[in-house]
């Protein structure tokens, strides 16, 4: 698949697998939308992205997926539409394990955070971005886990 000028949204792009994916896809000529919680980490990843292709652009979007709402997902749609007017792929990479403890000590608030980041946010982002994603000739959605 030719990734030149394809626009790819990567969640959890501030480090780890998300950072590597962003850097490697940019080397293939993709426009990268970096989505993560930590603006300073996102800035560092942005600085590592390849900008050598003429029309290549990248975008940083800061969001805490544990708190993602319909409104904030819609703001992400607007930002991507204004910058690129297209979206060819989403890589749902953001995930957390939560507290490593026995059930009796596991706090409900931590469980809610795990569910929000790992399940609710990918669902809500995909649902919200579906309209712009469907305009792509070959849209892709990838879910990762580690």
Which residues fall in each region the model found?
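Conserved glycine-rich cofactor-binding loop
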Residues: 14-15
